[in-house]
Amino acid sequence: MMKRIFLFIVTNLAILLMLSITLRLLGVDRILDAEGSELNFNALLVFSAVLGFGGSLISLAMSKWSAKHMTGAMVIDVPSNSTEGWLVETVRRQAKAAGIGMPEVAIYDSPDINAFATGMNRNNALVAVSTGLLQKMNRDEAEAVLAHEVSHVANGDMVTLALIQGVVNTFVIFLSRIIGHIVDRAVFKSEEGHGPAYFVTSLIAQMVLGILATIIVMWFSRQREFRADAGSAQISGRNKMVAALRRLQQEYEPSHLPDKIAAFGISGQKSQIGRLFMSHPPLEERIQALQSA
């Protein structure tokens, strides 16, 4: 279930970059320059919030479309075999138990054991599983994974993530413009308006701060994984969820999911750049949390 967050974050950053460049070319950044010499901090904060939350909410609105196109997921409109029929009926039953609308159900081609859920709200979601999951997990284990994803939807994790990302975006944009202003004035000695140094420095600072701010989003993601595990235990049974996580420990293979959507999966393998950037807690910690609940 490691696809959701990287998809959201990368889409979000791409939208922010595109909007920043577009607004700069349109001259909107000029409202941040009061009397040609100093930043207008009130205007900057409003600008940052509009741009920051705008990028986040656009990413949320695009999440289902992006996930389908990036994984090649095929939505099951009419089940063509017993496996698809079981998959749709299991999600339908779990969605009813969780009190949410019936999500779209899809399958995407990948040898990994993986699944993800995304969408704008509890009644407009997508739950997708890999062919590898259907081949390598028994139905009890697969049922637990589906319940985990349904719990993400029921908990409103995508909306909460969008709000957190909006706050993070706001501060990233705000601070990057201040850094650009300082460099433009102190290093390049611009005395009136903002020169090219402000634009270039602001974009670089925005990208660097955006990467660092990812730590906050990843921490949030790890906490939500524990909650989704607990939700799965309530819907499908704790033993089934523990068995599913154990299966991942035994069968895990390097993910073939696009990196941009890796954070909405289930695997939770350790990140090469450290735990701060992990979207999922280690599997053993998740198992221990379930067993001690």
Curated annotation (Swiss-Prot):
Active site: 149
Subcellular location: Cell inner membrane
GO process annotations (BP): proteolysis
Name of the top EC class for this enzyme: hydrolase
Membrane topology reported for the UniProt record: Multi-pass membrane protein
A cellular-component GO term for this protein: plasma membrane
Enzyme Commission code(s) on record: 3.4.24.-
Name of protein: Protease HtpX homolog
